Amino acid sequence: MKSDFTKLAVQALARLVKPLAALQMAALLAAAPGAWAQTPAHAAQGGDTILVVGDSLSAEYGLKRGTGWVPLLEKQLASEKKSAKVVNASISGDTTSGGRSRLPALLAQHKPAVVVLELGGNDALRGLPLDMTEQNLSAMTQAAKKAGARVLLVGMQVPPNYGSAYAASFAGLFPKIAKAEKAALVPFFLKGIADAADPVAAFQADRIHPNEQSQARMLANVWPELKKLLK
């Protein structure tokens, strides 16, 4: 359940920005304080391991278990007869700092062949320094590659609540890091959702988290790049 602070923040956001911009903040508010709950790890027998490290956009926040984009990924792998297994280590509320602190143990435990990094939204929600977000994502990418994994960065975009320069620089972090670290990239995780003709229909009642019907589109945004990393 959201805290009173979070509810007030959402209400204030709706008054301060256009409806579409508020929906584009989904990537940020998706990991609101008080929504900490790691999803169970799912792993089929055999094949490479795909480790997903994300926030509530990947942790099925507000969704029935098994309906999020990560469980849909497992079904996609099965339908294409890919033997890869999926470990979802996403936590609602996580930041790049939290992900960076958790990653070494996850790499040691699961020894993934592919690491999907879906973090950064909460950093922008809090207006954290962009250089810190960049350092954390770069360090996570480097650590995963050093452990022998291929990395997929999942990019986000935000409305200019902290100024257009901040929003542009934040969006630019993901391609910048991907290029520097030679990692794969999903340019915008919520493409076709936050920028849809009727974005309200793509979100849960809170108008923050993508609904069950949007999960397939989220997977569709990730799958083309992820598929290239699978052997």
State what each model feature region is.
Residues 16-34:
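Bacterial N-terminal signal peptides
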Residues 1-15:
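N-terminal secretory signal peptides that target proteins for export/translocation
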Residues 38-92, 102-111:
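Serine-esterase "nucleophile elbow" of acetyl-processing enzymes
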Residues 59, 95-96, 126:
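Alpha-helix N-cap/loop-to-helix initiation residues
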Residues 2-5, 82, 100-231:
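Alpha-helical cap/lid subdomain in secreted, periplasmic
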